[in-house]
C-alpha cells in the first residue's frame, strides 16, 4: 500500500523529539535508541485525539518501533543493556521492511547525503553480522 508506506515513512522518526540529540536540535530526556518506541507510544497515545482508532494507528506505531537498525531482538536488548522494554522489534510486514531498509541509507545528521550500500554495511558492522545479513537480503529484495 503506497499511501500507507509514504505516511508511515513520514512518521517513523516522530519520537526523536523526545530524545537528547543536540546535534539534530532535539533536547529531550531519552537516549536516541528510544526514538522508535517513543514514537510508537506517541502515536498510540494521541490517536483518539486525531479521530483515529487504535487499530488504525497500530500499523504506523509498529513501523516506528521496528525500524531501528534492521530490527532489534529481545536478546540484543538484554545483551546490550538497551533502555528499551525487552521484546522483539523486528520488521515483519513488507512496508515495515521497506521503510527500515530505506532508512539505512540516510542519517539525521547528514540528511542530504545518501549512503552507499557499502556505507550502510559499514555502519551496521558494529552491531554484528546478523544485521548485515538482513540488510543484504532486503537489498536483494528491494535494491535501490
Q: Where are the language model's segments positioned?
A:
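C-terminal/domain-terminus segments
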Residues: 117-131
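Divalent metal-dependent catalytic cores for phosphoryl transfer on phosphate-bearing substrates
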Residues: 1-119
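Charged phosphate-binding loop/patch that engages nucleotide di/tri-phosphates or the phosphate backbone
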Residues: 127-144
